[in-house]
Each structure stands twice: as structure tokens, then as C-alpha cells.
Amino acid sequence: MRLLGKLRASAASSAPLEPAFSNVLTPNRIPEFFIPPRLPTPYAPESSPPAAALPRRCAAEPDLWLRGADDGAGRTDWDPRSQAALSLPHLPRALTAYGFCALLESPHTRRKESLFLGSPSSAALPPAPRPRAHTYGGGGGDAPLAPGARSPIATPAARGGPSPSLDTLAPPPRCRRLLRAPEGLLRRALRAGRSRGLARARSVSSGDGEDDDEDESRASPGSPTQAPVTSLSPHRDPRPERLEAEGTVTLGRAGGALRLAAEYNRASGRLRVRLLRAEGPAGGAAEPRAPVGCRISFVLKPRGAVVRRSRRAVLEQDLCLDGLSEDEVRRLAVRVKAENRGRGLERGRLLGQGELLLGPLLLL
């Protein structure tokens, strides 16, 4: 028994000892930290099956796919995102029981971690030509590959020899258009957004510009309808820089009206409102000797936020505001209050009041 114990101890000392608790962290055994974490694969790769039973993509790259011990029947890659990921060369794949290539699944979340499970060795491989490149983007993969360019890659794997070298797997320059497909999609989306913004700017332009376009189209009946659109520069702003309009404020109690003129400059943000004349009883027609005073105030909604107020009794006066954006002018309103400044009991009598929105007036 003593001899058997010595033999057993010598055999155990000659074999490499494995730690009893491999999942316990000690100062001498701390794994390298990565984001996202690189977890070990719970199964080891088996020997590669014959190339005749493999699809063309897996046979061309035998080192990029791993066959798991459990090929779940519920695994599916029919969604568009998985189909697009299958066309990328650096993602690991697994062979299903039916002979198809599928993406590997994460062992701890049971999700397709197509970007996190790739090993550094497989990620360093250059992209190889594959016929399903058109599933990821619109460019690339339209022209079929020549059989001569595909034979040197598939021949070593079919004969059971060593895996092809990196120089052999290097694709021709025309097959690298797959990596530039997202840039084309982004460029197309930006161009579509720019065209929508230009169409919106044309829709909110003033009516004077639309009348000018109609006059130009009527002046040249022989010219095609697309000629005015193509003659405009794409960088030119179709909206006018200065907007001018006139409006009438009706005084409800007195039955009269006040005529206002508004002018807005887009470049400087300057708004100018001028009270032109008073019509009806507010203009002094009923009582010629009684002076009329108009109190004008700019009101920003919500009501009560008074920006500027004028108490002068002069009708033709200019009220200016600087540094206003289009959104502020769109919400701005002119509130006019007319009162009689006569003598005795008639003094301070309210003749009427009204309000005029500047946004619809200036077509903003």
C-alpha cells in the first residue's frame, strides 16, 4: 500500500495540477478587463466536417465558424438585421443541423451578440467575397464573382488541407464596396432631409414670391414647367429678406378701425409697426373737436408680458423692436386701445380696442 501511494503521488506530481476552484479570484489570478467582457466559449470546436456538406460561405472560411454541441432548433436568422450581419466577414458563425450558417449566441444572455463574440484572430481577417453582400447595402455584390476567383479559396478546404493564408483570402478591390454601404445610406438620408427642408421653406414663403413665380411662368408659355425650378441655385434662400404688410384692427365698441403697417427684416431681426390712420368714430368723425389718443402695446402670449408700451397721442408714430426671431414674431400680437381724451365726462371714455396677430399678417 505504501508503494502504491508513492507511485500515485509521483504520477500526480508529474501531471500538471489544475486549480481546485478556478472561479475564485486571487491576487495571482485576475483576468484581463475588457468592455464588453470576453467570456470563454462553453464548448470546444470539433473537427471540421467534409467540405461537400458545408455551404459555400462556410467552406470558403472554415476558421470563422464553430459548431456547437447544441444546435437549437429555435435558432433563426430570418430577420433583416441577422441577414445583414451574416454578410459581414468578421462575425463568428455556427453550422446548424440543416447545414445552414447561423450567428453564435451568447451563453449567458441567449441573445445574438454578433459584435461582441468575435475573437481577435477572426476579427483581423480581411473581408472575403461573398454572394450575399447585397443583403446589407444597395452597393456591392451586384456583379457575380468569376469562378476562377472563387476556386483557389474553396479548393484547400475541399481537399482537407490546411486553411488558406491571408494573402489567398485577400479579395479584389471591387469586393470592398460592402464596407462603404452605410456611408451611401447616410448620404442618401441627408440629401432627403435637405430636400424636405427646402420644400418646407418654399411652402412658408410670402405670397409675393409665389405671385412673381406665376408671372414668370405666364410670361414664357413656350418654356417647360421645370425651367424656373432648375434655374434656381440650390444654396439660394427662396424666402425674401424683408416682409411688409398692412392690416386693419377693428374697434368693437366704437365701430371704427385702425390701419397698421408692419415690416420685419430677417437679417437684423428688426420689427417696425406704424399706425397709419384711424377710420370711423375713432378718427374724430363724430366729434371733430375731441382729440383721440391711441394706446399701443406689444403683447407676447401668454398675455400680460408687455414688451413695450407707448402712451403718446400721435397717430403716425413708429414702434421698433430689435433682435426678434421668426418664432417670436410669429407669436407676437399688436393690441390697440382707443380712448377719447375730451373734456368733462367724455374724457377717458373707451372708444374701442382690438388685437392683430403679426404672424398671419406677415405670412410667417
UniProtKB/Swiss-Prot annotation:
Q: Positions of the region Disordered?
A: 118-175, 192-242
Q: Which InterPro entries match?
A: C2_Ca-dependent_4 (IPR039208), C2_dom (IPR000008)
Biased composition annotated in UniProt, kind: Polar residues:
220-233
Ranges for domain C2 come to 254-364
Q: Which PROSITE patterns match?
A: C2 (PS50004)
Q: Where in the cell is it found?
A: Nucleus
Source domain of life is Eukaryota
GO cellular component terms listed in the entry, alphabetical order: nucleus
List keywords of the entry alphabetically.
Answer: Nucleus
Q: Which PANTHER family does this one have?
A: C2 CALCIUM-DEPENDENT DOMAIN-CONTAINING PROTEIN 4A (PTHR47226:SF3)
The record describes the protein's role as: May be involved in inflammatory process. May regulate cell architecture and adhesion.
Q: Which family does it belong to?
A: Belongs to the C2CD4 family.
Q: What is this protein called?
A: C2 calcium-dependent domain-containing protein 4A
Which organism is the protein's source?
Bos taurus (Bovine)
